[in-house]
Amino acid sequence: MTLTALTDWTNILNECIVSIPAVLTVPTPQNIGKLIVILNQLLAFAQAGFLNQQQQADLTSIIKNLITILTISPLNFIVLTNELQTLVNNLLSLINLFVIDNTTRQVQTQLIQNIILPLAQLGPTGATGLQGSTGATGLQGSTGATGLQG
C-alpha cells in the first residue's frame, strides 16, 4: 500500500470516527449527508485496486447497504448499527491484509475500533412508561437460628 493510499485510508477512518456518532446522536439530513459522502470516499478506495475481487465485492456491498439504509426515512437505528458493525468487522479483517509495518497496523486497528465505540455506548433514549404497581408481599421466611447466649 502506498503512503498516499494509507493517508487516504486513515483520513476516511478519522472522518468515520467523527461522523458516525453525529448521525447516531443527531440524525439530521446534514449529518447523514456527511456520512454518505465519507462512505462514497470509502467506496472509491475499495474500488481503487488495493483489494482482490472478493474483498472489493464484500466491502462494496456493505457500503452500498449503509448508503441505502441512510437514505430511508425514518432512519432505522437497529439496522444501521448492525450494518456498521459488519463494516467494522470487514475493515478489521482487511487491515490485516495490507502490507504495512506492525506499528502502523496497530494504529489502524485502533482507529477502526474507535469507529465502533459509539455503538457500544448507545443505550435506550426514549421516554419511559409509568411505573408498575407494587407486587404482592412474599411469604414469610422461616425463623433463623437462635443466637449465642450472653
What kind of feature is each model-predicted range?
Residues 1-41:
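Extreme N-terminal targeting and regulatory segments of eukaryotic proteins
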Residues 120-150:
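Collagen/collagen-like triple-helix recognition
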Residues 5, 17-27, 48-127:
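Alpha-helical bundle protein-protein interaction modules that mediate dimerization/oligomerization
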